[in-house]
Regions:
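A short beta-strand micro-motif
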Residues: 18-23
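Short, surface-exposed beta-strand-loop junctions and turns on beta-sheet-rich folds
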Residues: 37-38, 64
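Mixed-charge, Lys/Arg-rich low-complexity intrinsically disordered regions
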Residues: 1-16
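Short solvent-exposed strand/turn elements
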Residues: 39-58
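Intrinsically disordered, low-complexity, charged/polar segments
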Residues: 54-73
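Short beta-strand-centered aromatic/proline hotspots
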Residues: 27-36
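Pocket-edge structural micro-motifs
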Residues: 33, 49, 72
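Tryptophan-rich substrate-binding surfaces of secreted polymer-degrading and adhesive proteins
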Residues: 15-16, 43, 47, 66-68
Length: 73
């Protein structure tokens, strides 16, 4: 069995501390870290809403597909 590579923050388009704008909603978010989804080991971002302070997790592929715009890092 081949061991899958765990998420490496250097592999992500957005680095921890980056501030993002969601294109569709206009919401602002801060990236906290790059993690792995337990069931699949798929890389995922953990990020926080800068308005509500809610925490979110989104697969790396979705996060980097153009729905978020980098505003600062």
């Amino acid at each position: 069995m081949t061991k899958r590579k765990m998420a490496d923050p250097d592999d992500g388009l957005f680095k921890p501390g980056s501030k993002l704008k969601h294109i569709k909603t206009g919401g602002f978010y801060q990236v906290l870290l790059l993690a792995n989804i337990e069931a699949t080991l798929e890389p995922a971002y953990v990020y926080e809403s800068m308005q509500s302070n809610d925490f979110w997790i989104r697969p790396k592929t979705e996060m980097e597909d153009g729905r978020f715009e980098l505003i600062s890092f």
